[in-house]
A protein has these predicted regions:
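A Rossmann-like FAD-binding core segment of flavoenzymes
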Residues: 32-36, 74-98, 104, 171-266
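Beta1-alpha1 glycine-rich phosphate/pyrophosphate-binding loop at the start
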Residues: 5-78, 167-189
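Mid-to-C-terminal Rossmann-like scaffold of FAD/NAD(P)H-dependent oxidoreductases
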Residues: 5-9, 15, 28, 283-340
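FAD-site-proximal beta/loop scaffold in flavoenzymes
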Residues: 126-149, 221-227, 232-309
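Glycine-rich dinucleotide-binding loop and its adjacent helix/turn
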Residues: 113-171, 266
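Phosphate-coordination loops involved in phosphoryl transfer and adenosine-cofactor binding
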Residues: 7-9, 83, 148-151, 211
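Residue-level detector of alpha-helix initiation sites
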Residues: 16-20, 42, 115-117, 137, ...
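Glycine/Thr-rich phosphate-binding loops of Rossmann-like dinucleotide-binding domains
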Residues: 119-120, 162-163, 186, 235, ...
Length: 340
């Protein structure tokens, strides 16, 4: 009797570092698999961490941030559906709902829906002129806008916020940073470590407003000032760099279990609590190697590694992801700051 080989369909939702890592690993583990990536955006597989450095003219162009070309993905046999939004998952029937295209079945599903920014929750948040650094096409558009910006306010001294302060100063823009803490990266650094970094920003011309809370954005159609607990700052642009939060809307709707850090719960194989469904990247939580406490919102490198684990296992291979220690480092002003 002739044995019939059935091609398995592995669907990846999300085209960031985790999604592309998952798709590539799945195809490597099972070259015959029908591997599909669905992304609501125009591009996949780039480094969002590099966006501030293009804005600051330290990296010459955005094209250098892409991991590969669209032709490269086609050549590897990965089917990427660009500008195609997945709106629902029926884990029982093993189908996804695609906006404007009905339902599609899957054998294995990998959820890599990434992150959103924590909402600022203040009046004026719907005005034009608020920039959320995330999507590379939007970053390209904003980069042209920066040529005409005279003054900008960066909201919160997150790692991304620190990079944007430096980038805007390098563009010759009057730059203000507001943050409710007493110094930059207060949750991760001591004040004596942050002090020389803050001094280097002041030397670049930045205005630092610590112990200062955002209270609103004002303007008729576009933002013209930022209001704070310490007064008003006139500006042409506000860069919102609030905390990253896991985008779990699709996962919750699919019935995946969400953990204490508000990320999708996974095991060391990146398998979720639902059969046939894996997850990776900024939408999940993983244990810290020392405390074993779940943590969420790591780096693109972590997301890519998690994606490779998820993709390998979804395709039938075996790979484990170990608890993370989270060493980190970043440029801040003229300094490199980091920890472990």
């Amino acid at each position: 009797m002739r044995r019939v080989l059935v091609m398995q369909r592995i669907v990846v939702v999300g085209g960031g570092a985790a999604g592309i890592g998952a798709a590539g690993a799945a195809k490597a583990a099972d070259s015959a698999a029908d591997v599909r990536v669905y992304t609501e955006f125009e591009d996949v597989g780039y480094s969002p961490c590099g966006i501030p450095y293009v804005h600051g003219k330290e990296i010459p162009d955005f094209e250098r941030l892409f991991l590969a070309t669209k032709a490269t993905y086609e050549a590897t046999g990965i089917d990427i559906r660009y500008e195609t939004e997945v709106t629902g998952v029926d884990a029982g029937k093993q189908t996804i709902s695609v906006r404007g295209d009905g339902t599609t079945s899957y054998d294995k599903l990998i959820v890599c829906t990434g992150f959103d920014y924590a909402p600022v929750g203040v009046p004026g948040a719907d005005l034009d002129g608020l920039y959320y650094v995330k999507n590379i096409r939007r970053a390209m558009e904003w980069d042209k806008v920066l040529d005409g910006v005279k003054a900008a306010v960066v909201v919160e001294a997150s790692p991304l916020g620190l990079e944007m302060v430096t980038a805007l100063c390098h563009r010759g823009i009057e730059t203000h940073l507001i943050d409710p803490d007493a110094w930059a990266l207060a949750a991760a650094t001591d004040p004596d470590i942050a002090a020389p970094v803050q001094d280097s920003w002041r030397e670049l011309g930045a205005h630092l407003h610590f112990n200062t809370t955002l209270t609103g954005f004002t303007g008729e159609n576009s933002v013209r000032s930022v209001t704070t607990s310490d007064g008003e700052i006139r500006c042409d642009l506000a860069v919102v760099c609030t905390k990253k939060v896991a985008n779990t809307a699709l996962a919750r709707a699919a019935g995946l279990k969400i953990g204490s850090a508000n990320g999708v719960m996974v095991d060391e194989a990146m398998h979720t609590t639902t059969a046939g469904v894996w997850a990776a990247g900024d939408c999940i939580e993983v244990p810290h190697s020392v405390s074993q406490i779940p943590i969420q919102g790591l780096t693109g490198s972590h997301a890519y590694a998690q994606g490779k684990v998820a993709g390998t296992n979804a395709a039938g291979g075996q790979r484990k992801y170990q608890p993370v220690s989270v060493p980190w480092g970043m440029m801040a002003g003229e300094w490199m700051i980091g920890g472990v």
